[in-house]
Structure formats: C-alpha cells, structure tokens
Amino acid sequence: MSKRLPPLNALRVFDAAARHLSFTRAAEELFVTQAAVSHQIKSLEDFLGLKLFRRRNRSLLLTEEGQSYFLDIKEIFSQLTEATRKLQARSAKGALTVSLLPSFAIHWLVPRLSSFNSAYPGIDVRIQAVDRQEDKLADDVDVAIFYGRGNWPGLRVEKLYAEYLLPVCSPLLLTGEKPLKTPEDLAKHTLLHDASRRDWQTYTRQLGLNHINVQQGPIFSHSAMVLQAAIHGQGVALANNVMAQSEIEAGRLVCPFNDVLVSKNAFYLVCHDSQAELGKIAAFRQWILAKAAAEQEKFRFRYEQ
C-alpha cells in the first residue's frame, strides 16, 4: 500500500473549502483565486480517487467520503497548530517591537494583545505607534502593520484585514423622529467627517444619492473623534470596519444598512523576509493572522457592487 501523502497545500485548501462550503470564501481566507482553490480540490480528488464535494442547485455540499475526511483532517490540523504553538512558545523569547498606526493599535491590537501575552509569556511586546507610515521597516522594528495597496518591495507582506467604509451611528438614530432606515434617509441627518471630507462624497456617488449635501456636518481631525461623535448621537459617520468593529459588537454603534464602500487599500502585516520564521516573529505572525482571519469570518459585511 502506498505511503504517499497528499500535498499539504491541497489539504489546507480542502479544509477551508469544507468549513465554508464555498470555494469563493475559501479563496478569500487563503488570499488566492477561486480558480486556484478549484485546481487544488481537483488535484486532491484525483490523488484520492474519489469525489469530496457535490453540488445541489447552487449549493456546495460535502460527499459522504468528503465529510468523513474533513472531520479527520480538521482534527489533524488542530493538533498540528497546537503542537506548533507549543514549540514556538518554548523557543520564542525576547523583545518584539511592533510598529503601526495609532488608530489600529488603539481600536484593534491593544484590546486583543492579552491573548498573545498569555500564549507567549516569554515575548515582551513593545508597541510603537507612528503617525506617518514609511515604506520600509525602521532598524529597531521587528514587524509592522502597514496600510495601503500591499506593494512594499523587499519585505514579507501578508494581508491582514480588508478595509470597508460603512455608515455607523448611535442606535438612537434608528428610532428617533427621523428614523435612519435606508441610504436615502441620510439627507435628514448630520454627516460626520474626517479632515478630508472625501469619503461621504465617494459613498453617495457610488449609490447615486445626488440629493444629499455632503458638505454639511462637523469636521474632526482624527478618526477616533469621528467615532466618538457618532456614539454620542451627533450624526452618521463613515467608519473603517476595523476601527468600528468593537463598538458595533458592544452595541454602542450600529450599521443601519448594508451598503458599504469597498476600499482598494487594506491592512498588511510586514516584516523582513529573512526574519519571518524567527521564533518571536513567527509566533506573532501566526497569532495575528489567525486572529484577524477568525474575526473577519465572524464579522463579514455584505455589500452591493
């Protein structure tokens, strides 16, 4: 009997596709194309000599063999992940300097950092908040979270968080004298702006809301102040999904409708390619990428093209 094992990459793709029951969602999680997912699944099915998926109408389903295989693979991946984490926790020690924008640090990383500290007590994380992002890593920085299009030559670049801009407001605005139920209702409410004012103009143009005056409403110099104004019922803000997520989960903000502005930018984890697998850096990469992927799956926005 052959002892040959299927390619690990094909198994990773199968695991993602089986969890989501969607090649598209699996591709998004793994940051590959849907065609690449289909190719890996076919190669795995050819290797095994049986079908793992079947289609019913427009739904993707596991075959009986695929379901059984998925349950076994899922357990193996879980054991592999835990074994890797334990090994890295023993070898990952020392100071780790993380550079990022203050807004991402305050709203996302810092509230979640305790779970990393618990898993890797030997690593001393040092947060370096920078108001202006450079296109290269400073000499005293181990890893950074960059915002942009992902084009930073000479660095290991891994997509961390896709960016959407979504309308958010206090729950009180949904049931007030002028309830906010559809995008057209924005004409009856104060718009909150950051210094550029561009976001509301782009958003209303995308939805064809030509009757809305995007010049009205107060301007704030920092995105954190825009969110606070929205929380206190002073108007409607266009918020970055990463920054607004915790406020929405806590119930202080709501997203009144699903029409969101899809950004061409995203947040990326970057480090020197030659150092990516070093103990403390590899541990942080694995932790933050898994954390971000799990949260985006739970907190996915629907949007209209």
UniProtKB/Swiss-Prot annotation:
A cellular component term, taken from the record's GO annotations: cytoplasm
PANTHER family per UniProt: GLYCINE CLEAVAGE SYSTEM TRANSCRIPTIONAL ACTIVATOR (PTHR30537:SF26), HTH-TYPE TRANSCRIPTIONAL REGULATOR (PTHR30537)
Signal peptide range in chain numbering: none
DNA-binding region: 23-42
Gene: gcvA
MF terms (GO), sorted A to Z: DNA-binding transcription factor activity; sequence-specific DNA binding
Subcellular location, principal: cytoplasm
Pfam families on file: HTH_1, LysR_substrate
Domain of life according to the entry: Bacteria
Role according to the record: Regulatory protein for the glycine cleavage system operon (gcv). Mediates activation of gcv by glycine and repression by purines. GcvA is negatively autoregulated. Binds to three sites upstream of the gcv promoter.
Full protein name: Glycine cleavage system transcriptional activator
